[in-house]
């Protein structure tokens, strides 16, 4: 007897909810309450009624994405980018910029206000242009077997699929100018399958470009790249498994209005928003009320983004960074700018630094700009220095609140705070907060 196999029909397990949106959180998600549970809903605005697909359903909260609108907000905007909600770069192009900023301010102020009874001076948001602000982009490359061509673009949200792009609404004009030219260049490559990705950085002395490849680059392709770099006046870098080599152009740098130049390598971390970076630094200098009598410590200093401007205004400055190569670059930047009242040291700031020789110095003011994980491991030793002012630059409100609570327990109070709108149309919340002794 022959048994015939009949496959079971697949069932549709997609779960949906209908929600009335009450508020907007700082990440650009609509907030709803259903049977006492809080739901965070993508692509939804206050006063909208939406049908949503559930993405995550936990005991105390849920995450969903809007699929159909029964009621739409009159404030909803048409996104500028055709790839919005597919590309993972922007989350808030449908939200008016003032609404985005208000949600971020409200989130920070509510969290910090719970930490102390004394009033906090919440300052106006530090903001700039909402579009064309990114000076760095990373573009994935994929050989399309159907067209036999290279596709260049951004990864689709939550997948490895590629969205080909010819422009990006939040990238600087110098980067957008190059995108169609790069597409045309890649079509000429003899060995397109071995290409990985491209990074573009709009430095103040031109655009730096890095091409990642996985196998030996054919000489004909290398020549194509060199001619392109010469024609477009690029600083060209190639990256293989052996490392990175610069094959054309000068070293990239960015420059502050006071004349300080910071040279960097193509893969080094730099703030992507050039204008807001300088405004953030100027705010830090202003809030610290610097004088020629001050001795300042800069923790998580990188290559000297804050340290060099600090040193020009004080008696002495010391920068601490965990990555030795960045310590070297910071020292080189100080030497290039002829700033001599400055020292840099390597230290793991995920551990106590009380035994470090530089920690025996006297610092009356401290600045720290930690990663998203915050600075909890450094705070005990930091507080032992008994500085009169501590300025904390944060890229994560959760770790800022955690660390602020530690500082308050050590006898500091929050004097003032402000949101920095470093990344418009995204859920990132950058802030600057000043702590003083009680």
UniProtKB/Swiss-Prot annotation:
Top-level division of the source organism's lineage:
Bacteria
Disulfide bridge partners, by residue number: none
Cite the binding residues for S-adenosyl-L-methionine: 271, 300, 305, 321, 348, 369
From the Swiss-Prot or TrEMBL record, what is one GO molecular function term?
rRNA (uridine-C5-)-methyltransferase activity
Q: What is the protein's given name?
A: 23S rRNA (uracil(1939)-C(5))-methyltransferase RlmD
Instruction: Quote the CDD domains the UniProt record gives.
Output: AdoMet_MTases (cd02440)
Q: Name one GO biological process term.
A: rRNA base methylation
Q: Which residues bind [4Fe-4S] cluster?
A: 81, 87, 90, 168
Arranged from A to Z, the UniProt key words for this protein are: 4Fe-4S, Iron, Iron-sulfur, Metal-binding, Methyltransferase, rRNA processing, S-adenosyl-L-methionine, Transferase
Give the EC number(s) listed in the UniProt record: 2.1.1.190
Pfam families the record matches: TRAM, tRNA_U5-meth_tr
Member of which family? Belongs to the class I-like SAM-binding methyltransferase superfamily. RNA M5U methyltransferase family. RlmD subfamily.
Q: Provide the reaction this enzyme catalyses.
A: uridine(1939) in 23S rRNA + S-adenosyl-L-methionine = 5-methyluridine(1939) in 23S rRNA + S-adenosyl-L-homocysteine + H(+)
Residues of the active site: 395 (nucleophile)
Which NCBIfam families does this UniProt record tie to the protein? PRK13168.1, rumA
Cross-referenced InterPro entries: 23S_rRNA_MeTrfase_RlmD, MeTrfase_TrmA_AS, MeTrfase_TrmA_CS, NA-bd_OB-fold, SAM-dependent_MTases_sf, TRAM_dom, U5_MeTrfase_fam
What positions does the domain TRAM occupy? 8-68
- Gene transcribed to yield this protein: rlmD
Q: In UniProt terms, what function does this protein have?
A: Catalyzes the formation of 5-methyl-uridine at position 1939 (m5U1939) in 23S rRNA.
């Amino acid at each position: 007897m022959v048994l015939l196999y009949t496959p079971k029909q697949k069932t549709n397990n997609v779960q949906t909810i209908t929600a009335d949106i009450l508020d907007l959180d700082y990440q650009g998600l609509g907030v709803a309450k259903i049977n006492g549970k809080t739901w965070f809903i993508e692509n939804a605005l206050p006063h909208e009624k939406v049908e949503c697909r559930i993405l995550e359903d936990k005991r105390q909260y849920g995450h969903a994405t809007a699929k159909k609108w029964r009621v739409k907000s009159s404030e909803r905007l048409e996104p500028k980018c055709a790839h919005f909600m597919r590309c993972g770069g922007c989350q808030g192009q449908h939200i008016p910029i003032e609404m985005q900023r208000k949600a971020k301010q409200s989130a920070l102020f509510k969290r910090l206000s719970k930490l102390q009874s004394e009033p906090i001076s919440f300052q106006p948001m530090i903001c700039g242009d909402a579009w064309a602000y990114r000076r760095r982009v990373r573009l994935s490359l994929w050989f399309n077997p159907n067209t036999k061509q290279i596709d260049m673009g951004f990864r689709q949200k939550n997948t490895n699929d590629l969205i080909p792009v010819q422009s990006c609404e939040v990238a600087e004009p110098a980067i957008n100018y190059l995108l169609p030219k790069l597409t045309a260049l890649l079509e000429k490559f003899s060995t397109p399958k071995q290409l990985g990705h491209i990074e573009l950085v709009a430095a103040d002395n031109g655009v730096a470009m890095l091409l990642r490849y996985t196998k030996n680059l054919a000489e004909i392709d290398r020549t194509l790249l060199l001619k392109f770099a010469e024609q477009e006046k690029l600083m060209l870098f190639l990256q293989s498994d052996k490392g990175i080599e610069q094959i054309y152009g000068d070293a990239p740098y960015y420059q502050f209005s006071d004349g300080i130049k910071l040279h960097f390598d193509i893969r080094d971390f730099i703030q992507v928003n050039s204008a807001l970076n300088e405004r953030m630094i100027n705010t830090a200098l202003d809030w610290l009320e610097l004088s020629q009598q001050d001795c300042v410590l800069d923790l998580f200093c990188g290559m000297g983004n804050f340290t060099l401007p600090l040193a020009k205004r004080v008696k002495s400055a010391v920068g601490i960074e965990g990555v030795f190569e960045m310590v070297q670059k910071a020292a080189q930047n100080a030497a290039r700018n002829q700033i001599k009242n400055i020292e840099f040291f390597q230290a793991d700031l995920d551990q106590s630094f009380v035994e470090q020789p530089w920690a025996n110095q006297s610092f009356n003011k401290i600045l720290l700009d930690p990663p998203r994980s915050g600075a909890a491991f450094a705070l005990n030793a930091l507080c032992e220095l008994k500085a009169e002012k501590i300025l904390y630059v944060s890229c994560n409100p959760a770790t800022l609140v955690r660390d602020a609570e530690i500082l308050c327990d050590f006898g500091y109070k929050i004097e003032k705070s402000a949101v920095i709108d470093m990344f418009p149309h995204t859920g990132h919340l950058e802030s600057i907060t000043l702590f003083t002794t009680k």
